[in-house]
Amino acid sequence: MTPQDFYRTLEEDGFSLSSKQKEQFDTYFKLLVEWNTKINLTAITEENEVYPQHFYDSIAPILQAFLANEPIKLLDIGAGAGFPSLPMKILFPNLEVTIIDSLNKRISFLTLLAQELGLENVHFFHGRAEDFGQDKAFRGQFDVVTARAVARMQVLSELTIPFLKIGGKLIALKAQAADQELEEAKNALCLLFGKVIKNHSYQLPNGDSRFITIVEKKKETPNKYPRKAGLPNKKPL
């Protein structure tokens, strides 16, 4: 998929990009490839693969009408090279985006990237989700939390739901069908007062299947969650 194919596909979906937005995606791709030689950001570096597998996939929740171009507070956990939240931010500039990532080198890349792209209302923090999830400045503060290929739902729910306001939504982007994951995560979702409200499948332009699971937070998260860093992964709920 060339950039032109990408823009054409978005136009067919009702999104006509401005010259500025096209330049932002172009700059994003170039910086991604440049920095990937310094730190491990992605195994996908060919232009015709980055546009469908990273950019298109990242904005899928917007294309599927799960997000609006409003000043909602969005947190991206383990965004790595900025996926999915920064492509979302390019398409929907009104989003207020916060990213937490455990690797400081990735935060350095994201900070430079946001400056080069001219993105406003983006915030980057280095650390573990488990630690920030117990910080009152972050806990229960977000309308939406996104996570793309971060962890199985049994673990992911504990890393993300504490950040949500009541009524807020976790949007989890997956490469595999989530049915088995959701079965395993029933206890975790119950303890964290999260309810699955949508389990959606779609296709990338190349025909590959992808999946979006949306979980709504129904009540305040019990104070003991998230547990200490590493425990959610070692001993899932």
From Swiss-Prot:
Gene3D superfamilies: Vaccinia Virus protein VP39 (3.40.50.150). It is an enzyme of class 2 (transferase). CDD domains: AdoMet_MTases. GO terms for cellular component: cytosol. Transmembrane segments: none annotated. It is found in: Cytoplasm. S-adenosyl-L-methionine binds at G78, F83, A129, E130, R148. One of its GO terms (molecular function) is rRNA (guanine-N7-)-methyltransferase activity. Keywords: Cytoplasm, Methyltransferase, rRNA processing, S-adenosyl-L-methionine, Transferase. The keyword Cytoplasm applies. InterPro entries: rRNA_ssu_MeTfrase_G, SAM-dependent_MTases_sf. Its main location: cytoplasm. The keyword Ribonucleoprotein does not apply. Its EC number is 2.1.1.-. Pfam families: GidB (PF02527). Belongs to the methyltransferase superfamily. RNA methyltransferase RsmG family. Specifically methylates the N7 position of a guanine in 16S rRNA. This is Ribosomal RNA small subunit methyltransferase G.
